[in-house]
Design a protein with these regions (language model features):
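A helix-boundary/hinge signal
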Residues: 1-362
Length: 362
């Protein structure tokens, strides 16, 4: 899969891969391509087994005692808690039925002295038979302090006869297990990538979206990245011949790119959207505030402009073309009409019918 993505063949070398595979296999919102991470997806799917074992114990396969990996079991345990009823199914020591966690986690020193056969007792069994009788007598001082704390907590526990215990899945609004919520929880805590929403919710073709994704991650083969790898590279930006070529300079900060963006933002009637000389693509793109009904239209045009500037750069570097803002604007206009004909840009709306008004011809 990695070889097909980067080179269209089975085998590739590390230098062909512009982004590490574990980063590619993350959700688009946090900077990946949304390709499933099979290891995490497998763990998320297998978390369904302990869920069904507790919520539907009459399934035929339950008697086979299927082994669940620690990773899947960890997902299940992190996502579930018990709503206590009659205490017939909630496990006293290992289930999350107290308001703030599991006894085994809240009181690990005490739990270490609980006899193993008793660790699977239900809340009702533990309360009727005396949960303190399941603890070895030679407790440490810390375990004894936790024992006293548990005695105090148990004073407020009341069972509700006739009401079954209920296991709740915290990561889904329905309270029921879903593989998607289990999988997405594996990425919880990661920061949303700048520009991710704008890139992937635009209507641009997939090729252009992937380019914008690489550009936002600074993974295009510009001179700065080639230089770090001691590879042949242009000595300066092929547009202005004044600064080192970086992807942000090339697409936004260069005087050439700013000339193009000036025409675009003026055509929109939004000159304040003009990128600064030191802007980064993801941050600048995220900071744009179009009206809700125009967001996808604006995001699509931004992708088109960046894609066209990049192609013109490649014409200069590889084909010996001369820098020309007029050529870039004309190509934006021509390709924009093709995108409009394909339904990627609206025919009617607040944007001009042509993607950009050329300064020199119209």
């Amino acid at each position: 899969c990695r070889g097909f993505l980067w080179k269209g063949r089975r085998d590739v070398q590390g230098g062909h891969c512009l982004v590490a595979w574990d980063q590619v296999c993350t959700p688009k919102e946090i900077g990946g391509l949304g390709i499933p991470n099979l290891r995490l997806l497998n763990a998320a799917l297998r978390a369904r087994w302990p869920w069904l074992e507790r919520t539907d114990p009459h399934r035929p396969w339950n008697e086979f005692n299927l082994q669940v990996s620690c990773e899947s079991l960890g997902i299940y345990r992190a996502a579930t808690h018990c709503v206590l009823g009659d205490g017939e199914s909630a496990r006293f020591w290992t289930d999350w039925w107290l308001w703030d966690g599991r006894i085994e986690e809240l009181m690990p020193n005490l739990y270490a002295f609980v006899r193993k056969p008793a660790r699977l007792k239900t809340v009702r069994q533990a309360m009727v038979e005396g949960w303190w009788q399941d603890i070895s007598p030679d407790m440490t001082t810390r375990a004894l302090l936790e024992f006293i704390a548990l005695v105090d907590r148990m004073q407020d526990v009341d069972l509700t006869p006739g009401t079954e215990d209920r296991i709740h899945w915290a990561w889904d609004s329905t309270g029921q297990f879903s593989a998607k919520s289990a999988y997405m929880a594996c990425f919880a805590g990661r920061i949303e990538a700048n520009g991710a929403t704008q890139i992937w919710r635009s209507r641009a073709p997939a090729t252009c979206k992937v380019f914008a994704w690489l550009a936002a991650r600074n993974r295009c083969w510009t001179a700065d990245r080639l230089q770090r790898r001691h590879l042949p590279h242009p000595s300066a930006c092929p547009f202005c011949d004044q600064a080192q070529e970086t992807i942000d300079h090339l697409l936004l900060g260069c005087v050439f790119a700013r000339q193009v963006w000036s025409c675009i933002t003026n055509a929109w009637g939004k000159p304040s959207w003009m990128p600064t000389a030191h802007a980064t693509l993801g941050q600048w793109w995220t900071a744009l505030t179009p009206q809700r009904q125009l967001r996808k239209e604006i995001w699509t045009v931004v992708t088109l402009v960046a894609w066209t500037i990049w192609r013109h750069r490649n014409d200069i570097v590889f084909n010996g073309a001369s820098p020309s803002a007029e050529v870039v604007l004309r190509r934006i206009d021509e390709e924009g009409q093709d995108w409009r004909a394909a339904g990627l840009l609206r025919e009617h709306g607040s944007l001009p019918r042509r993607v950009v008004r050329l300064d020199s011809g119209e």
